[in-house]
Curated annotation (Swiss-Prot):
<keyword id="KW-0547">Nucleotide-binding</keyword>
<dbReference type="InterPro" id="IPR017555">
    <property type="entry name" value="TriPribosyl-deP-CoA_syn"/>
</dbReference>
<keyword id="KW-0067">ATP-binding</keyword>
<keyword id="KW-0808">Transferase</keyword>
<comment type="function">
    <text>Involved in the formation of 2-(5''-phosphoribosyl)-3'-dephosphocoenzyme-A, the prosthetic group of the acyl-carrier protein of the malonate decarboxylase.</text>
</comment>
<protein>
    <recommendedName>
        <fullName>Probable 2-(5''-triphosphoribosyl)-3'-dephosphocoenzyme-A synthase</fullName>
        <ecNumber>2.4.2.52</ecNumber>
    </recommendedName>
</protein>
<dbReference type="GO" id="GO:0051191">
    <property type="term" value="P:prosthetic group biosynthetic process"/>
</dbReference>
<dbReference type="InterPro" id="IPR002736">
    <property type="entry name" value="CitG"/>
</dbReference>
<dbReference type="GO" id="GO:0005524">
    <property type="term" value="F:ATP binding"/>
</dbReference>
<comment type="similarity">
    <text>Belongs to the CitG/MdcB family.</text>
</comment>
<dbReference type="GO" id="GO:0046917">
    <property type="term" value="F:triphosphoribosyl-dephospho-CoA synthase activity"/>
</dbReference>
<dbReference type="Pfam" id="PF01874">
    <property type="entry name" value="CitG"/>
</dbReference>
Length: 290
């Protein structure tokens, strides 16, 4: 009788980064209670989304994230060839997402944000702090993909109308909502002993306090954005999601945003980006990949 071989299979760096990106998307989807977003309780302000669809969409994006990391390793430097390669891969990933979800846009913004971060992380595994990775991602985002389709997304239309910073500008600036809001709040809440789920909720709320979320602007206009930002600040000012008063404020915010049809999908994408960077930075997870 042969002993079972329990040695874990060695995975490549690209595979590991793709795993982390998918994990971040699933962790974001599972996090509950999120205001007006799909979570374990229900569909939030959405009629076309549910948790199982979010999971399936995230898993469908694994090949695209892996190929982006492989492209970074192949090209080895920030430049137009790499930018256009990951742009093509991202568009292919979007088609895989839409095939899985039967045409529902679950993660278009996340493909952009997490794809850039996966690529940036793969470019230099010896420099994986959040600041270093987001700086490389910003340099990539600033390059113009000549093959990108030009029709304006909903987010881009709203960004033009309201003068808001869209997903492209967020990346080109080095993800300030992540580096200055999400990650610091995640670390503060952990240090205060609030527990991982509450720390992640607080990180989402911190992003929401300042983000001109184009998903909210598209669905609910400036009234919805004001409600999101001020409501998120009220939760944090009340002690965050780990406090009784903060939980009450969070419930109130959830109900208010649902009534306004204001779902902060941009903030959710940036929370997923925060969770990805946190895992890369905190656990040194890239060290064991080959």
């Amino acid at each position: 009788m042969h002993a079972l071989n329990l040695q874990p299979k060695t995975i490549t760096l690209a595979e590991r980064l793709a795993d982390l990106a998918v994990d971040a998307l699933i962790d974001e989807a599972d996090l509950s209670p999120k205001p007006a977003l799909v979570d374990r309780r229900g569909n939030g302000a959405h009629t076309d989304l549910h948790l199982g669809l979010m999971h399936a969409s995230a898993l469908a994006l694994w090949p695209a994230f892996k190929e982006m990391a492989e492209a970074a390793l192949e090209f080895g430097e920030i430049g137009l060839p790499l930018r256009e390669a990951i742009g093509r891969i991202g568009r292919e990933g979007e088609q895989a997402m839409l095939a899985t979800t039967h045409g529902v846009n679950t993660h278009r913004g996340a493909i952009w944000a997490l794809g850039l971060l996966v690529t940036a992380a793969a470019l230099d595994t010896k420099s994986t702090s959040a600041g270093a990775v987001t700086l490389r991602a910003a340099r990539l985002a600033l390059l113009d993909d000549r093959y990108a389709p030009r029709p304006l997304s909903h987010g881009a239309q709203v960004a033009q109308r309201y003068g808001a910073r869209g997903a492209r500008e967020e990346a080109q600036l080095g993800f300030p909502s992540v580096v200055q809001r999400g990650l610091p709040q995640l670390k503060r809440s952990r240090a205060a002993g609030h527990g991982e789920q509450n720390a992640r909720l607080d990180a989402l709320l911190a992003i929401m306090t300042d983000l001109a979320d184009t998903c909210v602007l598209y669905r609910a206009g400036e009234q919805g954005l004001h409600a999101m930002q001020h409501g998120a600040r009220a939760v944090l000012d009340a002690g965050g999601s780990a406090s009784l008063t903060g939980r009450r404020r969070l419930h109130e915010l959830d109900q208010q945003l649902i009534a306004l049809n204001a779902s902060p999908g941009g903030a959710a994408d940036l929370l997923a980006a925060s969770l990805l960077l946190d895992r890369i930075e905190r656990d040194g997870i890239l060290q064991g990949a080959f």
